[in-house]
Regions:
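C-terminal motif of bacterial Sec signal peptides marking the signal peptidase cleavage site
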Residues: 13-16
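Repeat-blade elements of multi-bladed beta-propeller folds
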Residues: 32-36, 78-101, 128-155, 190-217, ...
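Extracytoplasmic beta-rich repeat domains
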Residues: 64-85, 115-141, 172-197, 212, ...
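Structural motif
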Residues: 155, 162, 216-224, 291, ...
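Phosphate/diphosphate-binding loops
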Residues: 334-383, 634, 644-647
Length: 649
């Protein structure tokens, strides 16, 4: 009876929704069907009811308390920042919790229609604490409609969007065991889990993985990517991100290191060109992120963009952004697909932003760079057993969107006292251009290599946003430098000769060591490769006691407690993001500030104070004649909730 009622409610809501469709991605205008809005991952909502003149009037229309908070305490695990991306399909919202529960909601009121619980907590503790699940995937063939989720319990689940029940025709009553069909088995299976959503195109569901980065023992699993039949759950193919014997790229792992190396996984979001039948994989660094002496060679397909045939898993093209990485420069976000015109030539393009602060732009069908990418010599390591690649790829266009490398000229110098202290502190570190290698702590009297951007800096997992109408890409970034020093682990604790020790929050008098800006948003026209505008994002430490008399402009937020937050959303006229009140107003403040800029100029147009700390990527949708903005927030204090904003009636 309850299911009949749910179906009736859904039917009524469907009748109220506009059938109008956006030409760019075949998604009905007003819907948000995938984590990035569509499989292009453009994060663009072609809506304009909320605009610069009324943005500051936004108020919370409704809130949805995470069902995680109702789980029995003896079953639930501590959860992290709530970063889920809600989906809206024909007026119904679907959103996951950190424990992987899926809720269907009336997207106009927040009324709960159903909740599905995969009960992954019954399968043992999660690999990563606190627990976090970042999204779900919607799939339809035009008749059947499903939600897919990859859980922390190593399950792929198919849920009927109308009933909230597992699909009995998929796998074992709706569940596929992701511990199977992985290939190499001589590793620690407990070191792998899932957090980002799968991607489903055609009749195929593709699943990445989340693997622990700092294992002290070399038994991490390889990050092979697997695909399943969307109807039956049958295993379809596996792409070995670490090529096995006889496969292309296997020779880039010297001394048979491919047999024992792990990671090189796809832990973040993926994108796909549905018409071309291509899925794009952003891959991570191989095991031991910071020392590669046992895995000499280029190490394909680590830190790469890999284009695969969706139906077969065959490699079409790839590009490695970092050869033999030792900086933890994962390709950390979904690439953006956009059609551009360069020198009169139409190009179906793909743009990949990175932790390195480079933007790599290619023809997404052929893999040809839109502008030349040059292999340039880089500094080499003097660590015994290590051999770095002699060159690294440098795009000639666009210019970097954040600081790269460090010299004395980059040190903070607002006052003579600050400048002198910064210079003295910098003497403890190796300074140099991007790709300066880590050192063994204490070498030549230095603590570590000062790496800029750091592993959490540049563009991280929120990635970029691209306007399909103009070809302008918007990139939120942070400098976030840190010191990388290698140390010998205590006897008997590791089979690595070196593990990493990080030096963080380095700087004089509680200030950053570098000059601002510390966080920024950059707009780049992908038709020309030129920067359109760049702004510091956030006030930063302008009110520091040693700076407050200088009346400084915004310096960019210093990210007081996180490496990356939710990224940016664009609409017809706006660029929307948020800042933490503790960075902008008061160190003791709890909430956030929802912020809107003019997307063509970067001009600040409006702000809204929010009484919750926001963490998830913002998205926007429309039901009937009303536009909404939704963001997930809370999480560490048993306050996980979804906040939905709208203009007053």
């Amino acid at each position: 009876m309850k299911n009949l009622f749910v179906l009736l409610v859904i039917t009524i809501l469907l009748s109220a929704c506009s059938p109008e469709t956006s030409e760019e991605n075949a998604t009905p205008i007003g819907d948000w069907r995938h984590h990035g809005g569509n499989h292009n991952s453009d994060k663009y909502a072609p809506l304009d009811q909320i605009e610069g003149g009324n943005f500051s009037e936004l108020e919370v229309a409704w809130r949805y308390r995470s069902p995680d908070l109702d789980l029995p305490k003896d079953l639930a695990y501590p959860t992290g920042d709530y970063r889920a991306v809600p989906l809206v399909v024909n007026g119904i919202m679907y959103v996951n919790s950190n424990h992987g529960l899926i809720s269907a909601l009336d997207s106009a009121t927040g009324k709960e229609l159903w909740v599905f619980d995969p009960k992954s907590y019954e399968l043992g503790p999660p690999l990563f604490f606190p627990l976090q699940t970042r999204g779900i995937e919607y799939w339809t063939d035009g008749e059947i409609e499903r939600i897919f989720i990859a859980t922390s319990g190593k399950q792929l689940v198919s849920v009927d969007i109308h009933t909230g029940l597992p699909d009995p025709n998929f796998g074992n009553n709706g569940y596929v065991d992701l511990k199977q069909n992985f290939g190499r088995l001589e590793f620690e299976m407990n070191n792998i889990t899932h957090g980002a959503p799968p991607i489903a195109v055609g009749s195929t569901v593709i699943v990445g993985s989340k693997i622990y980065d700092f294992s002290m023992i070399n038994r991490s699993p390889p990050g092979h990517v697997r695909a399943y039949d969307a109807y039956t759950g049958d295993f379809k193919w596996r792409f070995n991100t670490i090529p096995q014997a006889g496969e292309f790229g296997n020779e880039t792992w010297e001394n048979d290191s491919w047999r024992v190396t792990g990671n090189t996984n796809v832990w973040t979001y993926m994108s796909a060109d549905e018409e071309a039948g291509i899925v794009y994989l952003p891959t991570s660094t191989p095991t031991n992120d910071y020392w590669g002496g046992f895995r000499l060679g280029e190490n394909l397909f680590a830190e790469s963009i890999v284009a695969l045939d969706i139906e077969t898993g065959e490699r079409i093209w790839h590009f490695q952004t970092v050869h033999h990485g030792v900086w933890d420069y994962d390709v950390a976000s979904a690439p953006n697909l956009v059609d551009i015109e360069v020198d009169g030539k139409a190009i179906k393009a793909i743009a990949q932003v990175s932790k390195t602060a480079f933007t790599y732009v290619f023809d997404r069908i052929t893999g040809e760079p839109v502008w030349p990418i040059e292999e340039r010599p880089v500094a080499q390591s003097d660590i015994p057993g290590e051999r770095l690649h002699p060159t690294q790829p440098f795009p000639t266009k666009p210019a970097p969107f954040d600081r790269q490398g460090i010299s004395e000229d980059d040190l903070i110098d607002f006052t003579p006292e600050i400048a002198e202290t910064a210079r003295e502190m910098a003497k403890e570190y190796v300074l140099g251009p991007i790709f300066t290698p880590p050192i063994v702590r204490g070498s030549n009297g230095k603590r570590s290599t000062f790496v800029v951007p750091g592993a959490g800096g540049g563009a991280n997992f929120p990635g970029a946003t691209v306007d399909p109408e103009t070809g302008i890409i918007y990139i939120p970034s942070a400098t976030l430098p840190h010191g990388m020093g290698l140390v010998a682990p205590p006897a008997g604790t590791s089979d690595w000769p070196y593990t990493i020790q990080m030096d963080t929050q380095i700087g004089p008098f509680g200030l950053p060591l570098l000059k601002p800006p510390y966080r920024r948003i950059t707009a780049i026209d992908l038709n020309t490769g030129e920067h359109v505008w760049q702004i510091p994002f956030g006030k930063g430490p302008a009110d520091h006691p040693m700076l407050e008399h200088l009346d400084l402009p915004p310096l960019g937020s210093v990210f007081s407690d996180v490496v990356a937050e939710g990224g940016v959303l664009i609409t017809k006229t706006l660029l929307i993001s948020y800042l933490a009140q503790r960075d902008e107003i008061d160190p003791e403040a709890h909430g956030s500030i929802l912020v809107a800029h003019d997307k063509m100029t970067g001009e600040l147009l409006g702000e809204v104070l929010v009484d919750q700390r926001l963490h998830g990527p913002p998205m926007s949708y429309q039901v009937g004649d009303k536009q909404y903005i939704a963001v997930a927030g809370g999480g560490r204090d048993d306050d996980n909730e979804l906040l939905v904003f709208a203009l007053p009636n």
